C-alpha cells in the first residue's frame, strides 16, 4: 500500500435483535501523515465486552481506549512489542478495575487490533472478536477464536463440524480483564 492509495475507513456497531445494550466498542486511528504511517501505521481496534450490562460496555471501552493510547505512547519499542505491550496494559487496567469494585467483578472483553503498515498488516487478538480480509470479492478469516470449540478443533480432538454441533460456541478461553 502506498500513502497515495485510497483507504476508505468506517465503523459501525449495532446492538442487534437479541440484546438490550451494546457492549461493542471500536477505535480507528488513521495516521495523519505519511511519516506517521511509515513509522507506526494505521491502528484499528474492536472489543466486545463481557459481564452484566454496563460492566461489559465499560470493559470494551477501556480496552479500545487503552490499546490506542498505550500503542502510540510506546514509540521507543518496535511495533510488534508495542502492540503486545498495549494489549497487556489494557488487560491490567481492566483487571485492576474489576478487582477494585465488587460491582465490576468479572468484567472483561475480547479484543482485536489491526495495524496497517507499509509492509503489511499485523494483528493482536484475544477472544472471539475476529479479523477478516476482504479482497477481490473473497472473505478470509485471519484470526481464530480463543474458544473451547476452536481449541478442540486446533488440537484435532474434534472436527470443525463436530465442534459446531457438540460444543457451546460462546465459551471463550481468553479475554482481557478477568484473570489479569
Placement of each model-derived feature along the sequence:
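PP2C/PPM-type serine/threonine phosphatase catalytic domain
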Residues: 1-180
Amino acid at each position: 500500500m502506498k500513502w497515495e492509495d485510497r483507504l476508505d475507513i468506517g465503523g459501525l456497531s449495532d446492538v442487534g435483535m437479541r440484546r438490550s445494550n451494546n457492549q461493542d466498542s471500536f477505535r480507528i486511528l488513521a495516521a495523519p501523515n505519511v511519516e506517521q504511517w511509515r513509522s507506526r501505521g494505521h491502528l484499528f481496534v474492536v472489543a466486545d465486552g463481557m459481564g452484566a450490562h454496563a460492566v461489559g460496555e465499560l470493559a470494551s471501552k477501556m480496552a479500545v481506549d487503552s490499546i490506542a493510547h498505550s500503542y502510540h505512547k510506546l514509540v521507543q519499542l518496535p511495533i510488534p512489542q508495542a502492540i503486545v505491550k498495549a494489549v497487556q496494559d489494557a488487560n491490567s487496567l481492566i483487571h485492576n478495575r474489576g478487582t477494585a469494585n465488587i460491582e465490576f467483578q468479572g468484567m472483561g472483553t475480547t479484543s482485536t487490533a489491526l495495524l496497517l503498515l507499509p509492509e503489511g498488516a499485523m494483528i493482536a487478538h484475544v477472544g472471539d472478536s475476529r479479523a477478516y480480509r476482504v479482497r477481490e470479492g473473497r472473505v478470509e478469516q485471519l484470526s481464530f477464536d480463543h474458544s473451547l470449540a476452536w481449541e478442540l478443533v486446533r488440537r484435532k480432538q474434534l472436527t470443525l463440524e463436530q465442534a459446531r454441533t457438540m460444543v457451546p460456541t460462546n465459551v471463550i478461553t481468553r479475554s482481557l480483564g478477568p484473570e489479569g
